[in-house]
Design a protein with these regions (language model features):
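Long, hydrophobic N-terminal alpha-helical segment
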Residues: 2-54
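Structural motif
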Residues: 5-9, 31-34, 58-61, 80-83, ...
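Short, flexible loop segments at the rims of nucleotide/cofactor-binding pockets, characterized by
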Residues: 9-13, 61, 119-121
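Short secondary-structure boundary/capping elements
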Residues: 13-17, 63, 127
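Short gly/pro/ser/thr-enriched loop/turn and capping motifs at secondary-structure boundaries
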Residues: 41-43, 68-69, 90-91, 111-114
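Short, hinge-like loop/turn segments at secondary-structure boundaries
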Residues: 51-53, 79, 122
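Ordered, amphipathic secondary-structure segments that act as subunit-interaction surfaces
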Residues: 61-107
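Glycine-rich, aromatic-bearing surface loops/beta-hairpins
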Residues: 97, 102-160
Length: 160
């Protein structure tokens, strides 16, 4: 058992869906998707739906934030992982808990009350901005990009 090789961490409200399964997994050559979300870790129906979108040859692991921090050494040698979180706050909790995240892709954060749109697929509120700033201050490289086939957008949009 060893720590997973996290190729990329991604904030995506939908967690596993078509874009993640077909584009990001292929682009990264990932063989493992780690979904870190307190609800998804225990919600079998949600896991089943996400599992249908995942490629058959890719291992999918569902963990709560606490489990991800405590069990970060419970992965197999050779795991090349795409780590998915629903919010920047979850990514920050992982980093503060000792999970090594070098690069965070901010992909899809849906618009809802209290948020403002900063790109076509990302809306943030004050809590999101604070977590993203803290991640950047901790040395995490931030990337604003929906899919790998398009160039990254200016990350400063996240803080406007």
């Amino acid at each position: 058992m060893s720590e997973p090789n996290i190729l990329l961490a991604r904030v995506d409200n939908r967690l596993i869906h078509g874009q993640v399964a077909t584009q990001w997994v292929s682009y990264l050559d990932a063989n493992c998707i780690i979904v870190v979300n307190d609800d998804a870790a225990t919600n079998r129906m949600r896991q089943g739906l996400m599992g249908m979108a995942a490629p058959a040859d890719v291992k999918v692991v569902y963990l709560s934030v606490k489990q991800a921090i405590e069990e970060k050494a419970s992965f197999e040698e050779g795991d090349k992982a795409l780590l998915l979180v629903e919010t920047p706050a979850d990514a920050l909790a992982l980093v503060e808990g000792g999970v090594k995240i070098e690069r965070l892709n901010v992909g899809i954060m849906h618009m809802k009350d209290g948020k403002h749109q900063v790109s076509a697929t990302v809306a943030v509120d004050d809590d999101d901005v604070a977590a993203l700033k803290a991640l950047r201050d901790k040395g995490v490289e931030l990337e604003l990009r929906r899919v790998p086939s398009v160039p990254p957008e200016d990350v400063e949009k996240l803080f406007a």
